[in-house]
Amino acid sequence: MSRLIEHILRKAKNNKVIKKAYQSTVNSYLNSHIGEITPFNPRSTSFEKRRINLLVPSINQEHLFGGISTAINFFDQLYKYEQDSFRRIITTDAAPNSEDLLKFSGYTHVSSENDVDGNSQIVSFNDRYNKTIPVGKEDIFIATSWWTAYFAQRIVKWQAEFYTQKPKRIIYFIQDFEPGFYSWSSQYSLALSTYLYKGEQIAVFNSSLLKNFFNNHGYKFTEEYYFEPKLNSSLKKHLISFDKMEKKKKILIYGRPSVARNAFALIVESLRIWVWTQPNADQWEVISAGEHHSDVEIGNGVVIKSKGKMSLEDYANELKESALGVSLMISPHPSYPPLEMAHFGILVLTNNYENKNLSELHHNIYSLDNISPDSIAAQLTKLCTEFEGNKKAGDKESMADYLSEGEQFLFIQELSEKLK
């Protein structure tokens, strides 16, 4: 039988008709474009006032959390020191609808085709094929992702050439090592190239851990600043003293199957081992929060129940009730869920990554070098035993700066001066 199959394959390889059909099929699926860098073409304008531009993928409600929310907060804080300037938010990947714009009541939504001088504008530029956007001689750009940095770097080059002036400084708001979002590929190389830009670029890092990672790898910027994470102000309203929390035999996992760096499959495989090593696994409830997915049966009568993307109030209630947490982030960014869980009295399992070790930040965090399923399952069993022996095991001192109401971007006035 195997010889017959080999004979058929040899004949097929030499058949011109089959070859042509195969090539036609391959070509029909061939993608020679990189969607993220769809040309972002500027055009000249008579507008000469200083204007701060935030380049952000989206401001839609479904995206307005985590990194984008932090970037907009930074933009708002910077504008407090730029009162003589105009401001503009440019969305590159998605257009907001009327409901999305309710959170931006101080802004006017304008078309890129209109050259409007008004202040506080939102311009949707996701549908930009064969379109241009007005860029003046005093426009300054803040990039929030590798592709928006790619755009900004090209824009300031055009701006300098067209208006015959020195290239403007770019602010690069860096919240992770973004080449790591891709396998070795075109996108990997493009993301990396934005850190190697030869022009003047001010880096603002989300955490000293991330800044140190970049420094350790030899990436250099004109100026460098960093800020440390703080507990979400809305979530903080639900934070109560540990004594008032009713901790249950509940494990809360940060489950985002579509985000590779959160290692959802690895967490599930670890739990499949844990259910057979934990003597009373069927007494524990396992909840997944972050992104909706089907419930997952992991054996021994235990099911991972998906709660998806929860409201802050519902998420806070899960934090108050859960005894243990598992949240992985295969990147140098510290990640918010482990810190949130720890401050709500949860014993949290996470991972180290190069210079990142979150166990140094809070005693409720257990950060592993080896995150094989066996290693995670073994540590989870230890934490179950610790909680069952002491229901107050998670009652540990908080990070004062993380909970403080103080200014997050302490450097922002100095940065504003560097732009002038």
How would you describe each model-predicted region?
Residues G67-T70, I89-T91, Y188, Y197, ...:
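Conserved catalytic-core segment of nucleotide-activated headgroup transferases in glycan assembly
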Residues F125-Y129, H292, V303-L319, P334:
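Conserved active-site histidine-acidic residue motif and adjacent donor-binding/catalytic loop
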Residues N130-K137, S185-A203:
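Membrane-proximal helix-turn-helix segments that form the acceptor-binding/catalytic region
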Residues D139, K320-H333:
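Acidic donor-binding loop of glycosyltransferase active sites
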Residues F151-A152, F181-S183, Q187, G199-E223:
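A short, active-site helix/loop in glycosyltransferases that binds the activated sugar's phosphate group
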Residues I346-N351:
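Short hydrophobic beta-strand element within catalytic cores of glycosyltransferases
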Residues I371, T385-K420:
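A charged, aromatic-enriched C-terminal amphipathic alpha-helix characteristic of glycosyltransferases
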